[in-house]
């Protein structure tokens, strides 16, 4: 408690000593501002123009709102001019050459931001001004401006924006206040480095490329006098890592899923479901994009083109998938395969697409049974391919029995004669053979139907294969053609904010090792 009281008393003593020990500054302040009229422009003659110089020192690029087209900046507005009423002789005031006075007590140029979007048009914080014995007045007030900025979203998110800040006197014309840049060179109205970036905190979203300043003279319809302004152009290039990771890469991944629709087998029943799911995902991306960019109808942003291109591809893939599924599930009862379809999609295209169809094999037991039944229904019950054994014709059911061995000689086939005698005497066997013939006919029809269905499935598979390659090529070429349109991808200019900012240099400079 004693130490706090000691420091407090020490500060009071120093303050009192400073106030009492600087009578020259107090006397100078009283002499300068006792009869000073801050409402009158400080010129000797009314026709004289007062030169006011201005410069911006950018401290922070707070935000660039794309949707509302507003740039928010934190900067210092450096202004200087000569006021003949605020000059003095230092020898008469104890060698005092500089004096700090409240800016509210002196004349100030009404410099405002013409393209103000929100808030105050002029500086609201009235900081102190610095007076020099020569009459030079310097005033550096800080301010946070929200300026309107025309956003060009054509190449978003690989875009480059140029936002302007137009400063000028609201009341005085060019014949009364000659507005110029502090670093302006005689004979030119352009200053290449019009904004001071020495105290700039680098932005995590934008790189500063150029900051020129241009002096303009403009005539309005209301007045004959010119009105001067200094326009500061801030050219920025977006850092694309955030949007690349969160928008571009997911959208490209979804676009490549469109290709997999044609690789998915039709029997899975999920081809259309996958396409519609992709379409819904792209719709969500489109809604997110609409929340970011301004509602302009002049251009379509690059990311919007990419999402729209992918949506069109996915919609077309749904149409193709429906056609492929229609072909896949065809049957002999609904469609007949034309000869040219069989020739093109079964014999020609598979060779061109390097497709090999697996050989379709029926059940060997069913095939052997069908052949045996067919032979029995037409001739006899033995293998008709046996060499040396002719097949006798089948007599009508109501015909009288043949004489024994009338069809062949006993020496050639005695077993055949015995079989014929037994067969003609067994009517139940005729009914069994008729039933077997019916089953054989149904089996043949089923196998033929299966063969036709497999042919249609193969045609659908052949249809899927060229569209697989077509969509793969379309996605790769289309994505590259859209994304690579952005000129910032080929812009190799180094940002000047990192080079000129002393704060960024100090932060990037490695710390020395601690002493041992």
Swiss-Prot record:
Gene3D superfamilies: Neurotransmitter-gated ion-channel ligand-binding domain, Neurotransmitter-gated ion-channel transmembrane domain. This is Acetylcholine receptor subunit alpha-like. It is a multi-pass membrane protein. GO terms for cellular component: postsynaptic membrane. Disulfide bonds join 149-163, 222-223. Residues 1-21 form the signal peptide. CDD domains: LGIC_ECD_nAChR_proto_alpha-like (cd19031), LGIC_TM_nAChR (cd19064). NCBIfam families: LIC. Residues 327-465 are cytoplasmic. It holds the Pfam family Neur_chan_memb. It comes from the Eukaryota. Belongs to the ligand-gated ion channel (TC 1.A.9) family. Acetylcholine receptor (TC 1.A.9.1) subfamily. The lineage of its organism: Eukaryota, Metazoa, Ecdysozoa, Arthropoda, Hexapoda. The keyword Protein biosynthesis does not apply. Its main location: membrane. GO terms for molecular function: acetylcholine-gated monoatomic cation-selective channel activity; transmembrane signaling receptor activity.
């Amino acid at each position: 408690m004693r130490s706090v009281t000691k420091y407090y008393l020490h500060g009071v003593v120093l303050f009192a000593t400073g106030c009492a020990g600087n009578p020259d500054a107090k006397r100078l302040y009283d002499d300068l501002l006792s009869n000073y009229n801050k409402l009158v422009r400080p010129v000797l003659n009314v026709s004289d123009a007062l030169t006011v110089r201005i410069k911006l020192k950018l401290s922070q690029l707070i935000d660039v709102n794309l949707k509302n087209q507003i740039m928010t900046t934190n900067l210092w507005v450096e202004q200087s001019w000569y006021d003949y009423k605020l000059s003095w002789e230092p020898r008469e005031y104890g060698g005092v050459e500089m004096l700090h006075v409240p800016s509210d007590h002196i004349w100030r140029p009404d410099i405002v931001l013409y393209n103000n979007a929100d808030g105050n048009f002029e500086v609201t914080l009235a900081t102190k001004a610095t007076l020099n014995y020569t009459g030079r007045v310097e005033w550096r007030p800080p301010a946070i401006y929200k300026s309107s900025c025309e956003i060009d979203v054509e190449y978003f998110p690989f875009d480059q924006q140029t936002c302007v800040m137009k400063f000028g006197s609201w009341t005085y014309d060019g014949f009364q206040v000659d507005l110029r840049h502090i670093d302006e060179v005689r004979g030119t109205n352009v200053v290449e480095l019009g904004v001071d970036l020495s105290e700039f905190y680098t932005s995590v979203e934008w790189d500063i490329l150029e900051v020129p300043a241009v002096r303009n003279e403009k005539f309005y319809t209301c007045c004959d006098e010119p009105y001067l302004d200094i326009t500061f152009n801030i050219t920025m290039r977006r850092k694309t890592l955030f949007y690349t990771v969160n928008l571009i890469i997911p959208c490209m991944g979804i676009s490549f899923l469109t290709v997999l629709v044609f690789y998915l087998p039709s029997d899975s029943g999920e081809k259309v479901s996958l396409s519609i799911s992709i379409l819904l995902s792209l719709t969500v991306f489109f809604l997110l994009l609409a929340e970011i960019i301004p509602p302009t109808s002049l251009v379509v942003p690059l990311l919007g083109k990419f999402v729209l291109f992918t949506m069109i591809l996915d919609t077309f893939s749904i149409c193709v998938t429906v056609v492929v599924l229609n072909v896949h599930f065809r049957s002999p009862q609904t469609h007949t395969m034309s000869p040219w379809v069989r020739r093109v999609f079964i014999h020609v295209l598979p060779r061109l697409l390097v497709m090999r169809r697996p050989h379709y094999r029926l059940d060997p037991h069913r095939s052997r049974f069908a052949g045996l039944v067919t032979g029995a229904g037409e001739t006899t019950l033995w293998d008709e391919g046996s060499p040396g054994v002719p097949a006798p014709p089948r007599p009508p059911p109501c015909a009288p029995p043949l004489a024994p061995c009338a069809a062949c000689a006993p020496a050639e086939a005695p077993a055949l004669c015995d079989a014929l005698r037994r067969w003609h005497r067994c009517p139940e066997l005729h009914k069994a053979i008729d039933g077997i013939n019916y089953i054989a006919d149904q089996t043949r029809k089923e196998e033929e139907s299966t063969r036709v269905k497999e042919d249609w499935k193969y045609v659908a598979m052949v249809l899927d294969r060229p569209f697989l390659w077509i969509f793969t090529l379309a996605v790769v070429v289309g994505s590259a053609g859209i994304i690579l349109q952005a000129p910032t991808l080929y812009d190799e200019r180094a940002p000047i904010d990192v080079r000129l900012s002393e704060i960024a240099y100090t932060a990037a400079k490695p710390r020395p090792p601690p002493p041992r």
